[in-house]
Amino acid sequence: MTIEFFAIQLIGFLGTTLFFLSYQCRSNKTLFRVQFLSYLCYTVHLLLLGATTGGISYILNTVRSFCLSSEKHFLKSRWACGIICALQLVTLMLTWDGWWSILPVTANIAATIGGYTFSARKIRLTGMLINSPLWILYDIAVGSYAGILDEMVSEASMLISIIRFGWKNLTCDENL
């Protein structure tokens, strides 16, 4: 393992830290903003690893977080959700590199739909049951140790947030 490999993993670990902190934000708006920064780190990390589908897919996650934290009505609309999901499918077609390419795209479509419900419960459930498990498999396939840790930490963070805020208190965030 080279210094370059460790540097690439370090960029991913910064994304992991930011993503963990995102679920400790009570406001969905703040959660999406912190995730925006995390996704930027992961985009660079995955592209440097040569994981093109995951890297491009994370660019779309960055766009999604920007849209969901925006004040613009259209960016938080079902149309925007549909456009982002369609772009994920285009990414899959253009970057196909084997069956594992399906994993991040499916995960991110689920997370996009979950995010656009604006329900803290659905956001966390989608993350715990669909998004993280699929990303763990992809990260194993492409050699992203930071990604594997990120998803494990994300699972823990989502569970901690449910315990911390209480399931009943995780409802739609009216401040969006």
In which residue ranges do the predicted regions lie?
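Alpha-helical membrane-protein topology signature
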Residues: M1-L176
